[in-house]
Amino acid sequence: MAAWLVASGSAMAHHSLAGTYDIKSEGKVTGTLVKVAFTNPHGAMTIKVHNADGTDTDWVMTTGSANTLQNLGFGKDGPNTVKAGDTVTITYYAARNGKPLGFIRTITLPDKREITLSNGNSNE
């Protein structure tokens, strides 16, 4: 029983947004998708953002599971497809450690449609 409690606590900590991301701190970036991975338990996108000082920063943006994204029509195929080379705008929950990491809240596709991927649920 004790092992189950420890394991379930670890699983909840792993899947909790609040541990890694500040869901009260939203940011927004526009850039070019470099890499897209639709995987479980969480997908990820790397986006190259051109900074005002002329440098580029690669941001790693986490998403929900491939299954959740597929239910939204978002993925490798479907009505909301994205691929490397696409220019997108992402609103995200910022990483608590200040690094260029985030959990995607919305993504604006090249055709200007905005898709909500997260509502800030602490167990997404």
Where are the regions a protein language model picked out?
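Short boundary/loop segments of OB/S1/cold-shock single-stranded nucleic-acid-binding domains
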Residues: 12-27
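A short macromolecule-binding patch
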Residues: 52-65
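Short aromatic-glycine-enriched beta-strand elements
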Residues: 39-50, 105
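A beta-strand/beta-hairpin structural motif
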Residues: 62-74
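Bacterial N-terminal signal peptides
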Residues: 1-10
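Short nucleic-acid-contacting surface segments enriched for D/E, G, S/T with interspersed K/R
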Residues: 71-89
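Conserved hydrophobic positions within beta-strands
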Residues: 29-33
